[in-house]
């Protein structure tokens, strides 16, 4: 069904998505005797301990106990009742949650040891299909892409959730991430931010950490350009393959509105026509997550725009074609900088990575190399191989298999060399899987 002048009126999904933020049995009696007395004493001591734990709990235990589990056991396992004990709170995208900020705050008060200690915890979420890849090299590339994310998270104190299950079969392909992110927010109330990273994105700067303080007044961050969104009205004005979303009620409502333009909606076909007519550069008549996101921001009176941060100051997500060919030169610039900074060349434990990353950042600034982007020499934070489809092999017709394959391998080796350095190795070349030992005091100035 195509959009026409006489098309039926649709209630905008951001209106539907916006909501008000509201608020044992006793054992048989034993026969008398020393053993029986000892058993009775032990049972009494255990019962007394359970009563003390129950009385000391700040949460009410008046609700009916679950089948087969005593209330004392529940209190010991979970520290008292939380939103997890409410059957009305669901993990699925079709079951809206209300009062999430209060529910999450209550859980954090009950689990202060998991509250982050004043920092903002980040959960990276990524994933791939459950079945084997169609491309011959696809599974190998996915393994290396997963390793890349594991490396970054280990070095920078980020948790990683990698999912291979299709949580909502009706929302597949680019829509599949929304149900996963929604479930992750409920499963990880300790995380202030959920960071979605497409499987075909490579973390190419192991030193860089998300500048969370600059997003303190925002709830959603994507790589994009305001003038392309609001003036050019382009569906490629931002990229939805990598985004940062705050774990809050606003975000749950935002994802409900976003998903309402997806394949679960009875108006899905109509939304495809609306988006195609709205974005003149959109070449396929289908409602996709990225076009839907731009459309939500464009609408007058949108409740989302003020809380969305379009990041363009660094490669929050960078287009691989403008990055892959520059990686070798970037390596040379870094090595030239380190030849003049002996402390940076010092061998160190991997656990000291954060300290050396901070020192390297300071040295970059001093050498005038801190600028990111096309004109800068800082390592790109994320290199996104959008359109390459390394698993299926069904790449964009504008890209050759060689350019995609070599680009991904270059980016992975570039990132892996930063990790291997702590182990005394590096790749023999940008397209080589072989590694060689690093000489002492690498990279020293040569004659």
Curated annotation (Swiss-Prot):
This protein's UniProt keywords: Glycoprotein, Glycosyltransferase, Golgi apparatus, Membrane, Signal-anchor, Transferase, Transmembrane, Transmembrane helix
Gene3D superfamilies in the cross-refs: Spore Coat Polysaccharide Biosynthesis Protein SpsA, Chain A (3.90.550.10)
Subcellular location(s) per record: Golgi apparatus membrane
Pfam families linked to this entry: Glyco_transf_34
Entry GO MF terms: galactosyltransferase activity
Membrane-spanning segments: 38-60
Positions of glycan attachment: 285, 329
Membrane topology type: Single-pass type II membrane protein
Chief place of localization: Golgi
Record topology, Lumenal segments: 61-447
Region feature (Disordered): 1-31
Biased amino acid composition, Basic residues: 8-23
Family the UniProt entry places it in: Belongs to the glycosyltransferase 34 family.
Name of the protein in its database record: Probable glycosyltransferase 7
Provenance organism: Oryza sativa subsp. indica (Rice)
The encoding gene: GT7
């Amino acid at each position: 069904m195509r959009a026409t002048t006489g098309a039926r009126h649709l209630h905008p999904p951001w209106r539907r998505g916006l909501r008000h933020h509201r608020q044992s049995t006793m054992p048989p009696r034993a026969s008398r005797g020393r053993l029986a007395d000892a058993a009775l004493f032990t049972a009494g001591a255990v019962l007394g301990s359970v009563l003390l734990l129950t009385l000391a709990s700040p949460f009410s235990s008046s609700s009916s106990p679950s089948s087969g589990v005593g209330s004392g056991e529940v209190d010991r396992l979970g520290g008292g009742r939380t939103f997890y004990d409410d059957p009305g709170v669901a993990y699925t995208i079709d079951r809206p949650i209300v009062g999430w900020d209060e529910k999450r705050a209550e859980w954090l008060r009950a689990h202060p040891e998991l509250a982050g200690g004043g920092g903002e915890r980040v959960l990276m979420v990524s994933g791939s299909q459950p079945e084997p890849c169609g491309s011959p090299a696809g599974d190998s590339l996915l393994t290396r892409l997963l390793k890349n994310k594991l490396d970054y998270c280990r070095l920078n104190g980020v948790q990683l959730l990698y999912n291979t299950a299709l949580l909502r079969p009706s929302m597949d392909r680019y829509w599949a991430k929304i149900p996963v992110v929604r479930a992750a927010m409920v499963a990880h109330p300790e995380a202030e931010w959920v960071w979605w990273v497409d499987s075909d994105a490579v973390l190419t700067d192991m030193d860089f950490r998300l500048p969370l303080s600059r997003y303190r007044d925002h709830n959603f961050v994507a790589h994009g350009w305001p003038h392309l969104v609001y003036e050019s009205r382009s569906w490629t004005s931002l990229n939805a393959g990598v985004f940062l979303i705050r774990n809050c009620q606003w975000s749950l409502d935002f994802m409900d509105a976003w998903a309402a333009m997806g394949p679960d909606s009875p108006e899905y076909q109509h939304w495809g026509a609306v988006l195609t007519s709205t974005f003149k550069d959109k070449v396929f008549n289908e409602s996709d997550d990225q076009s839907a996101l731009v459309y939500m921001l464009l609408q007058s009176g949108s409740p989302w725009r003020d809380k969305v941060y379009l990041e363009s100051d660094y490669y929050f997500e960078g287009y691989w074609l403008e990055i892959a060919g520059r990686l070798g030169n970037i390596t040379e610039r870094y090595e030239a900088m380190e030849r003049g900074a002996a402390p940076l060349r010092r061998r160190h434990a991997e656990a000291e990575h954060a300290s050396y990353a901070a020192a390297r950042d300071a040295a970059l600034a001093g050498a005038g190399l801190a600028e990111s982007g096309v004109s800068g020499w800082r390592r790109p934070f994320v290199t996104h191989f959008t359109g390459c489809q390394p698993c299926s092999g069904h790449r964009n017709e504008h890209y050759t298999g060689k350019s995609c394959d070599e680009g991904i391998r270059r980016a992975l080796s570039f990132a892996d060399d930063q990790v291997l350095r702590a182990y005394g190795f590096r790749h023999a070349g940008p397209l080589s899987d072989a590694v060689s030992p690093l000489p002492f005091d690498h990279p020293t100035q040569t004659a």
